[in-house]
Curated annotation (Swiss-Prot):
It comes from Saccharomyces cerevisiae (strain ATCC 204508 / S288c) (Baker's yeast). Its main location: membrane. It is found in: Membrane. GO terms for cellular component: cytosol; membrane. This is UPF0479 membrane protein YFL068W. Belongs to the UPF0479 family. Disulfide bonds: none annotated. It is a multi-pass membrane protein. Keywords: Membrane, Transmembrane, Transmembrane helix. The chain crosses the membrane at residues 39-59, 136-156.
């Protein structure tokens, strides 16, 4: 189990990372919940991915998450593959695994324990699905809406 203080630090890191380097996300409303040592985190996201410095946000998040690497394996699901190429060394150094959302599953679903949807308020959905592993339907990309998913899976502690 992750120490309570570290859990709070993780939430603050997520919040500051989401707002880092872009005015678009400054006033976002956040939903954070804990279930044991898993994190649920949801915030609204700007419609067009190319208008937001996603790479800068992810770099900040990866660097800050180095401290919790013994407690978490973090999986990042992102639609445009170009971000994976640029961030691959940084992601690897923090045990953050990248998966292209469109190629991750042949049946159109992404295996998930805790899914972090940006831009969409899914608090009622989380309330129902909070305590159990579940599968999340693929969210398709259109011209004005881009969704990408942070998948945070709690696995091995320092003592396991």
């Amino acid at each position: 189990m992750m120490p309570a203080k570290l859990q709070l630090d993780v939430l603050r890191t997520l919040q500051s990372s989401a707002r880092h380097g872009t005015q678009t996300l400054k006033n976002s409303n956040f939903l954070e919940r804990f279930h044991k040592d898993r994190i649920v985190f949801c915030l609204p996201f700007f419609p067009a991915l190319f208008l937001v410095p996603v790479q800068k946000v992810l770099q900040h998040l990866c660097l800050r998450f180095t401290q919790v690497a013994p407690y978490f394996i973090i999986q990042l699901f992102d639609l445009p593959s170009r971000h994976a190429e640029n961030l691959a060394p940084l992601l690897a150094s923090c045990r953050i695994q990248y998966t292209n959302c469109f190629s991750s599953s042949s049946n159109g679903q992404v295996p998930s324990i805790i899914s972090l949807y940006l831009r969409v308020d899914l608090s009622p959905f989380y309330a129902k699905k909070f305590q159990i592993p579940y599968r999340v339907p693929m969210i398709w990309l259109d011209v004005f809406q881009v969704f990408f998913v942070f998948l945070v899976i709690s696995q091995h502690s320092l003592h396991s």
